[in-house]
Regions:
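A conserved position within tetratricopeptide repeats
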Residues: 92-95
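Extended, alpha-helix-rich binding/interface surfaces that flank or overlap catalytic cores
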Residues: 2-85, 97-176
Length: 176
């Protein structure tokens, strides 16, 4: 399903910056499927739209609580066991400058996360108290480097994602 976004809304969001631009596109996509991506409505979106929603979810979780939180909250299979990293790498291949390298490096980060998810996912998704959840960060320091790498490169990654979307806007929405 391709959401329709007024051209002036896109212009206004782009003028506010990368985050506002991505938020507008992501919210329009999510609204087109009643606000939440799930197995029942995923087929209504194309691979590009699903990848943007995946990036949005990853960004929110990792910026809030790292990859441990992302996995604990049940997003591990969606992020790591689907072609998210591959699509991000392909987006990067279409870019000629440093942004392509940024997305290529980001895809490698996701593949590293997948290895850790496959190794520790069962333990990290167990129900637990808040104190037990906080203890996971001490028990699994392997995720620290992933968190640090994402946070250090987040602005560049987000800018590259936004640039790709801007260059392929018709894959994400219809502008009226």
């Amino acid at each position: 399903m391709t959401p329709i976004i007024p051209e002036q809304d896109i212009i206004n969001a782009a003028a506010k910056g990368t985050d506002a631009f991505l938020q507008l596109i992501t919210e329009a996509i999510l609204q087109s499927i009643d606000g939440q991506l799930n197995a029942d409505n995923m087929s209504k979106l194309n691979a590009e739209q699903i990848t943007l929603v995946a990036y949005h979810l990853l960004h929110e979780e990792v910026m809030d609580g790292g990859f441990i939180q992302l996995i604990h909250n049940g997003l591990g299979p969606f992020i790591f066991m689907n072609p998210f990293a591959k699509v991000i790498r392909l987006w990067g291949q279409e870019m000629e400058d440093d942004e392509g390298n940024v997305l290529h490096d980001f895809s490698k980060l996701i593949y590293k996360g997948r290895k850790l998810f496959e190794q520790y996912g069962d333990e990290l998704t167990q129900p637990c108290t808040d104190d037990e959840f906080m203890a996971l960060f001490e028990q699994y320091p392997q995720f620290d480097n992933l968190d640090d790498e994402f946070i250090e490169n987040e602005e560049d990654i987000t800018a590259a994602v936004a640039h790709y979307i801007d260059n392929h806007l018709s894959l994400f929405c219809e502008v009226k």
